[in-house]
Amino acid sequence: MRRVRLETAEPFLKRRVTFEGVLLSDLLAVADVPDTASTVSLTALDDYKVDFKVADVRSSQMLLATKADGKHMPVDRSGPIRIVFPDSSSMGRNPDLWIWSVASMQVA
């Protein structure tokens, strides 16, 4: 799967960060998620949960990031996996959707 770099305004750090990872839409394609699927649910280590519409994921540049500014992210720095959005994403304007320390993903 191709790795992607994305520089974006990180809403909690209040600065620009270059993230690296894979597009969530690419992961759904590799996993052969059917067109009948409607929801991608991500759950963090602290049980915080965010649901995304599959259609929104497929049409977005939402990134499952594993690196920030060239370094792997430890758990105490929002890692090891987190969701980030490009500046142009309307979903990215909602800080509640920036889930970090992702532990699991379910598609239904």
Which stretches of residues belong to each language-model region?
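N-terminal intrinsically disordered, low-complexity segments enriched in P/E/S/T
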Residues: 1-108
